[in-house]
Amino acid sequence: MGSPKRVLVIDNGSYECRVGWNNTKEPALRFRNVLTKPRKDRKKEAIPDTTDGAPTPVAAEVPAEIQVGNDITNIEAVRAHLKSPFERNIITNWNHQEQIFDYIFTKMGFEGEQSIANPIVLTEALANPNFCRQNMSELLFECYGIPAVSYGIDALYSWEHYQNRRKKVSDALIISLGYSTTHVIPVLNGKLQLQHVRRLNVGGYHIITYLLCLMQMKYPVHLNAISISRMEKLVHEHCHIAVDYREELLKWGQMDYYEEHIMKIQLPYNPVTATNALLTAEQKLEKRRELAMRLLEIKNRREGEKLLEDEQQLFVYNKLRQLYEQDKLQKFELALAQQQIGNLDELDSLISTISNRIKRIKERPLSSPKPSKQQEKIDKMPKAPEGVSQADWLAELQSKREQLLQRKQTRQQQRQEQGKRHTHAAQERMRIISTLARSEKRRKANGEEEDDGFGMNDNDWDVYKRINRYNDDSDSDADNEQLLEFEKILSHYDVNFDDGNAVQTQSAAENYQLHFGVEDIRVPEILFQPSMIGSPEAGLAELIAFVLKLFTAQEQQRMVEHVYLTGGCAQFRGLKERLAREFLEMRPFQSKFSIYESDDHTLSAWLGACVQASQPNFGQTLTTRKDYQEHGSEYFREHRASNLFYPTPKD
């Protein structure tokens, strides 16, 4: 088969799907590889008066359309209902995959055509099972009628794109960091060493989920506000990989470093404005009245809508009753079945129930706001005397209030002074009371003087507190009542009045802030330490060392001279430097290695597939319909960027 002019290239990733033509510089379609089916919507329809007398149902079930990728307007609102064709990086749900293909071909201009006339380049998982490829080939050839397909691995396509822009090399160690898994892929002499590939079951999905759990545990009050979408944005824009994780942790333990590098994320909230906080009693009452009026309007409108719906339903049921009275029994039975009504008695019962409900609604008067009980309290509020302005009256009340506060403070200070041992007042009272006690003792002892040891025990001094505790209760209670009355009047007439008892609370904005600090390095660290999420697998550095040990020293050196990073997680800042440190530790002394990365980690696989689709020998990589019919659905043609074909053993 010769090289076709236009090839449809589909990078079918588990996180994002990219679709476009091979002769373009970027994909025409990019979307999240998920779909959802919204809840069914009951839409009301008009009830025409048909000529045959058969009524139309008041409400009909309108089937909900499946939304795919970019058609999902609010992905967080339907997060619980999102579906994916993937289980990790393997396609397992073929109904969902078919719906995604329908979306792709519709957006790419194939809507209404009987078959797809262009060949397709499609990415698949590394070591994709034959069963999955068999289902994919059957779907493409049988359902969509494509002429040919070429399967390839996204990481190898990305490597082809990198080589196309630079020099060609035949040996490399490709590290593919995907959404669900991470692979270490050795390539020798231009061929994939599939038997030595190793996989780490940690990817972008696990990083995002780990951050979600950490933030929800850290801020349980904002559980609903900490969503997956917000965590994805934090991971994509702010997380980075530490070159020395332990050293970075020690830095975050220092308060100065924490204050300098902490990132505060403001969650949405409804602030309390100063205008609302300084409203007078009349203004607050007016706002409550307006709110009550709005609620009553909503209630009356809903009752009106319910009344209209009942009248329409009653109209339909009366039409049904007329069919029975006109002896049109066949139409009557059909209409009953459409309305899901069992028999005539049930119909009469529904007519009676709806009629009574309509009658009650029409007889009931519209709700009106009740007179507020707060108005009586406002009317009883003291007012300025005749001949005195309100401003002068309030100033006089403020002056009297300050005098009461000063008197109260003086009494409090005196009470505290009397309770202390070393003040002059306490010593004077001690002398007087001690003298009285001795005098009383002498009278009882018939003139004999003796020291009773008063004051040697600290508990003896409590007598002053007991004596002076209630000596001014009557004056204090009267002052407190008068003070409360003054403050009540001042707060009612003066919006700027401050009674001095307001508690300084933390800003509402700060209560809705998330501190994103050590999570910056802690979350992506699970690539190197999967044990942080409870995984028993080795980290990325140990995995690379294990793969290299499967080859000879000369082969190891050839591969580490071209270490290539690809995949979405390869975008983390610091990954290249961290891997350089790990290679320096695991490689022999003074040995050389080089680490490269693509210019665009998310598009490099799609661009590499476009490069292959534009090659003169591209036709040799295509699995045609003839190959599909002759060799079976699991067969495919191998090439530099594809998996290796191992036929399924026959029983």
Curated annotation (Swiss-Prot):
Annotated coiled-coil positions are 394-418
Tell me how this protein assembles: Component of the chromatin remodeling Ino80 complex.
Basic and acidic residues: bias regions: 373-383, 417-428
> Where is the stretch described as Disordered?
362-388, 404-428, 437-456
Q: Which protein family is named in the record?
A: Belongs to the actin family. ARP5 subfamily.
Which Gene Ontology BP annotations are present?
chromatin remodeling; DNA recombination; DNA repair; regulation of DNA-templated transcription
Pfam families from the entry?
Answer: Actin
Keywords, ordered alphabetically:
Coiled coil, DNA damage, DNA recombination, DNA repair, Nucleus, Transcription, Transcription regulation
* Descriptive protein name: Actin-related protein 5
InterPro entries on file: Actin, ATPase_NBD
Q: Where in the cell is it found?
A: Nucleus
Q: What's this protein's function?
A: Proposed core component of the chromatin remodeling Ino80 complex which is involved in transcriptional regulation, DNA replication and probably DNA repair.
Q: According to its record, what are the GO cellular component terms?
A: nucleus
